[in-house]
Amino acid sequence: MERRAWSLQCTAFVLFCAWCALNSAKAKRQFVNEWAAEIPGGPEAASAIAEELGYDLLGQIGSLENHYLFKHKNHPRRSRRSAFHITKRLSDDDRVIWAEQQYEKERSKRSALRDSALNLFNDPMWNQQWYLQDTRMTAALPKLDLHVIPVWQKGITGKGVVITVLDDGLEWNHTDIYANYDPEASYDFNDNDHDPFPRYDPTNENKHGTRCAGEIAMQANNHKCGVGVAYNSKVGGIRMLDGIVTDAIEASSIGFNPGHVDIYSASWGPNDDGKTVEGPGRLAQKAFEYGVKQGRQGKGSIFVWASGNGGRQGDNCDCDGYTDSIYTISISSASQQGLSPWYAEKCSSTLATSYSSGDYTDQRITSADLHNDCTETHTGTSASAPLAAGIFALALEANPNLTWRDMQHLVVWTSEYDPLANNPGWKKNGAGLMVNSRFGFGLLNAKALVDLADPRTWRSVPEKKECVVKDNDFEPRALKANGEVIIEIPTRACEGQENAIKSLEHVQFEATIEYSRRGDLHVTLTSAAGTSTVLLAERERDTSPNGFKNWDFMSVHTWGENPIGTWTLRITDMSGRIQNEGRIVNWKLILHGTSSQPEHMKQPRVYTSYNTVQNDRRGVEKMVDPGEEQPTQENPKENTLVSKSPSSSSVGGRRDELEEGAPSQAMLRLLQSAFSKNSPPKQSPKKSPSAKLNIPYENFYEALEKLNKPSQLKDSEDSLYNDYVDVFYNTKPYKHRDDRLLQALVDILNEEN
């Protein structure tokens, strides 16, 4: 009896703690004097309800028909408590389908948490836009650009395409933006007027939207700043982040003028703090759905979303319902080194990647800035999404009839695996596509995308189908620490029905999971074709006891596969926290795709080299000093570095055995220049004093050996390029793997001289 009483007390205590946590989360909300309601009777019914119940009718919410926003005549502007009695009176009205009091939402701008084409344009910062042009000194260096120039050379520059940036405003009178500014694609939802001009303050906090817009549409050849990816497109700004953000404001922004705007670019989302789980509210979700169904005269709005900057916080973008949406194209970042940056998040919903900032030694992104200024320090996935939006604008100029799903297929089929190949995590799915949780299907390639979109050859993808798979007899399954729940899901993918699916696009696993510590859960889904995808990785900072309620975990990793067969879901907790417990309450698998294979997928994807030299660190070994005679078989240089064949080298480019020969002069100068905090030199490097090059090669390779030992890393999967493993912090304050290598070289130089 005593044991049972003690057990009941413990259970009561756990429930009390959960109740406190839930109410604590709610207590942080700030409710505003606005109510959203769905009223099928139209404006007349909405006006009548407002008059009868003491509201002012503020108007329709964005493009959502029969959805209206009300303001109560006798309620404070803000309150920590919801006005439940007012909401109930409104929702109980027979003319109202649904009603909700609006509350403030925390939204974070996704900038980083730290803060031969050279003569093509006369814009002063054009030669710093390394991601748009091939700025290599020699062919041995990695090719970095997004293949935009070949598209421009076809005369495709974004003409006739309208992009709007959902952010903190747009300095539309900026010299490098004004010629391309479109007031019909602009609005200020913070102040409810048609001018999205940002609010100035001493810290220039509201520069984000102007920078994002500049990346897309900076004017070319006007002697100002740089050049936008789609420099003849039209750009607008939606000011919605510089004030209270509610579901109604988000819906109005996402659904603004969808008959005129082609592409919406958003570089924000819920907090990237490693513990938030949040997605679009009811209204924003409906705005997404309306956009893809009605936007662009029925072809569908293109929504481009930055994948998030919570990498350092251990965040996972599968907990962000905006990037996790089937309606958005989620874009991640790659650094100038071709690596996953320190801020990037991993998730199964990321579709593709463009460039952005990396470590402090890497160059960043150039754009327009507040006060008619320019910047070369735009950072984070915030900078990646607008570059993608600009590339999509080029595709829409080439083929205005592309649907929103056509665009996603084009991205999947043309993104490049090769330039990012030396990062861990790549896998080939059952349709032969290379995919990675860090990068999606790879680096965007503007030329390949626009070429495939050619209206003379492109065939629009078949009609979208949706097949829901669930077990009506499923009983809740318990899960505890160090435990595992395995669910086998056999499916015929609605075979024989109108919604049968033979070629997959998105896959959603919708589940309600109750758990005492949400961040300890790990969810993996294996497709019928054998592709294993992490839908949720552990998040150390997420201590919430709230679990997941009808949450959609979305994956693109099985794109193109035939779904027929048995899928396997694994939900585990390997944290070792013995007090953890919970249960899987319900689930369903939602398959999105087509009943027939899209035309462009009837032949397998063929991956070709993105660059003539493999795009990794080993490229520098073949680099030749431009000022020196190149070695030939007849006249070999004594200092040429020769490595063993791949069969005698260890994994990850480590050299266990190397033939004698000192490192090349060019290699050392490249490494030394890269270690500088300044931007890399734009001219050919001058010859260094010969004394600086007299380095015992044994020491050099010893340094390489120590710095590349996988055994020092905690996670074997990430042993090659996990740049931020905590174990390294104990010895050196350098956060980037290359920094440690370069510092070792500098130490050798100092010792020898």
UniProtKB/Swiss-Prot annotation:
Record's comment on post-translational modification: O-glycosylated.
Q: Where is the active site?
A: 167, 208, 382
Residues forming the P/Homo B domain are 460-597
Propeptide residues are 28-110
Give cofactor(s), names only. Answer: Ca(2+)
Primary localization? cytoplasm
Where is the segment annotated Disordered?
A: 596-662
Q: Where is the signal peptide?
A: 1-27
Q: State the Gene Ontology terms under molecular function.
A: identical protein binding; serine-type endopeptidase activity
Q: Please give the function described in this protein's UniProt entry.
A: Involved in the processing of hormone and other protein precursors at sites comprised of pairs of basic amino acid residues. Substrates include POMC, renin, enkephalin, dynorphin, somatostatin, insulin and AGRP.
Q: Which disease is it linked to?
A: Proprotein convertase 1 deficiency: Characterized by obesity, hypogonadism, hypoadrenalism, reactive hypoglycemia as well as marked small-intestinal absorptive dysfunction It is due to impaired processing of prohormones.
Q: What is this protein called?
A: Neuroendocrine convertase 1
Q: Which organism is it from?
A: Homo sapiens
